[in-house]
Amino acid sequence: MADSPTIVDFLLTSPSHSRPFEADAHYLADGQPKPLVVFVHGFKGFKDWGHFNVLADYFAQQGFVFVKLNLSHNGVVPGGSGDLEDMEAFGHNNFSIELDDLGALLDALHQPGTTPLPATELDLGRLFLIGHSRGGGLVLLKAAEDPRVTAVAGWAPMSDYDQRWPAEVMRQWQANGVQYIENGRTGQRMPLYYQLAEDFQANRTRLDIPVNVRTKLRQPLLILHGDEDETLPLQMAHDLKSWKPDAEMVILPGANHAFGGGHPWPQHTLPEHAQEVADRTISFFKNLG
């Protein structure tokens, strides 16, 4: 039987705001430096959604330190239920906040003693990012601006924030100051305040995925997307590949947006497609040396 990973939980803060946010790390504690994977959830996601803890254990058993975080304004309250419950925080989230949250985590990992992770367990020269869905777009942007990142994997990644907003929706959103979306899983009515769009426009140079992938993303990139994705079109994967021709792209037949996962996930094994995504990502990272 495989060894059980050590799991440590910790709180983070960002210089961009005053809201603390949670992260955890799964690893086999052997005192040897291991490559580090940082995993970023997507829109309406959180670090303990579905099979993500099974995923973290699997990566740990394959020789990685696997760190995942709750982005600070994702709706999860530190010490709360673990699910989405703070709708005001959710509504005031934006892409700059998320990028800065991820940066705060990377900074903390590079400062011994800032997290409970022993420095002896970390090989910071092999720092990999994985992002799912909107988190996939986020890790592309972070890698483009942060040379500490060794390589990136996008799992059903968003390729462009801008094209998701039709002109009529934008007009109504600006006029009302807020739009609401429904969480199909919980039935919650979730606000998105117009500041999200304002932040994107004000920081477009930093937040424009197509431009940053074409001009600044130098690290190796793996793109994984299901051909039955019901949330983000498969064309997004092809777009990313066209902007970064040296990227490796894998289309998974029959895979949906969550690669077979759901919340809650009581099983102790990964969904079939999530297992394939994990294995392909592990091989990609390990082949980089």
PLM regions: where:
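Short, surface-exposed "cap/lid" segments of acyl-processing enzymes
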Residues: D30-G75
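Hydrolase active-site cap/lid region
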Residues: E145-Q195
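Alpha/beta-hydrolase active-site loop
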Residues: E88-T120
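Short alpha-helix in the alpha/beta-hydrolase fold that links the catalytic acid
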Residues: F52, Q219, L232-W243, P264
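Short beta-strand/loop motif that positions the catalytic acidic residue
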Residues: K216-L217, I223-H225, D229
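N-terminal cap/lid segment of alpha/beta-hydrolase-fold proteins
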Residues: M1-G31
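Acidic catalytic loop of the alpha/beta-hydrolase fold
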Residues: E228-L232, H257
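Catalytic active-site module of serine/aspartate enzymes centered on a nucleophile-bearing elbow/loop
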Residues: A255-F259, H263-G289
